[in-house]
Amino acid sequence: MSDPIIIIGSGFAAYQLVKSVRRLDAHIPIQIFTADDGAEYNKPDLSHVFSKRQTAADLVVKSGEAFATEHNVQLHAHTQVERVLTQQQQVVANGRCYPYSKLVFATGAQAFVPPMRGDGLAKVMTLNSLQEYQAAEQPLSRAQHVLVIGGGLIGVEIALDLATSGKQVTVVEPNARLLANLLPEFIALPLEQQLMKHGIQLALNSRVESVTVQGQTLAIALHDGREFAVDAVLCAAGLKANTAVAREAGLSVERGICVDLQLNTSDPHIYALGDCAQIEGRMLPYLQPIVLSANVLAKQLVGQEARLTLPPMMVKVKTPSYPIQLAGDFSPESHWQVQLSPEGIVAKAQSSLGDFTGFVVTGEYVTQAFPLLRELSQRANG
């Protein structure tokens, strides 16, 4: 019997890959190594647990054991892969060696916590996994005032959800506006107004200098001298790919594990996908590219030829009172055709040559997102 495919990780990317492989081959041996219990859950739901009053247990779709049985895989739960021996084609976990025919890194990413001072750093929570929510669930449910570090996609969604659930919320963001890496300024401003309508306090152009325990509360000092007394601090300041084992194994690693359009790393027997992978220089921490990557990689693993093609992809900002959808490419140099109304905004980006390169729609106009995405895709293919 040939050595199995080994997948390191049990998040969305890993399980999407397993499902894709099993659609092509019901019997090829697969082993999954995961540091947690391997439960299947929908990670984007973590941004909306407070308004829905969901516990960590509510988010579990299937236990790790049930997933393994259903998809005919061997699950090594609570088993950390310590090293990869590329010459021998083995992984080392808990001191034992396990051989592989092909190895897949689906190790995801960890929440990035910016450098701060103070004796309260251990109380700064993150919400990047089911296990992290389990740890944060009780402190956050008791908290009346929550400070969110980071005004990007996840930070904004969580802040609005916390406010909707009745909590006082302060967002600290180092950029001059929210979602600075995603949205043009004329879209970010109405979003900021919506958040302030929900009572959310915004500290833009700011960063947290220190977190100090003061009795039952946390004293937060910003770099500009402002101070807040809060009950909880939640950090949503971006992600950092989990690449340590891959780097130690000698694989090419930059911001993520470097892969080509076949999801192959610098080792012909090793692949990577999901939040840990850097595809042709790009980090793509969204669900759609992971699904597309899983389909391509599944074919590779069963001996078929496939290459990843990435169409224009939609990004949704799930802020119910002011929904935003966007796709394509735009930059500070883009020219914009903008349609404004009290119901929302339709904005189309054009290059200096007048080519349609991307769009943003908000409010009630999110219904126009798919026709615009279709138009964008047709132009990209044309």
Curated annotation (Swiss-Prot):
One of its GO terms (cellular component) is cytoplasm. GO terms for molecular function: oxidoreductase activity, acting on iron-sulfur proteins as donors, NAD or NADP as acceptor. Its EC number is 1.18.1.-. Its cofactor is FAD. It is found in: Cytoplasm. Keywords: Cytoplasm, FAD, Flavoprotein, NAD, Oxidoreductase. Pfam families: Pyr_redox_2, Rbx_binding. Its main location: cytoplasm. Pathway: Nitrogen metabolism; nitric oxide reduction. It catalyses: 2 reduced [nitric oxide reductase rubredoxin domain] + NAD(+) + H(+) = 2 oxidized [nitric oxide reductase rubredoxin domain] + NADH. Disulfide bonds: none annotated. NCBIfam families: PRK04965.1. One of at least two accessory proteins for anaerobic nitric oxide (NO) reductase. Reduces the rubredoxin moiety of NO reductase. Belongs to the FAD-dependent oxidoreductase family. HAMAP family: NorW. PANTHER family: NITRITE REDUCTASE [NAD(P)H], PYRIDINE NUCLEOTIDE-DISULFIDE OXIDOREDUCTASE DOMAIN-CONTAINING. This is Nitric oxide reductase FlRd-NAD(+) reductase. It comes from Vibrio vulnificus (strain YJ016). The lineage of its organism: Bacteria, Pseudomonadati, Pseudomonadota, Gammaproteobacteria, Vibrionales.
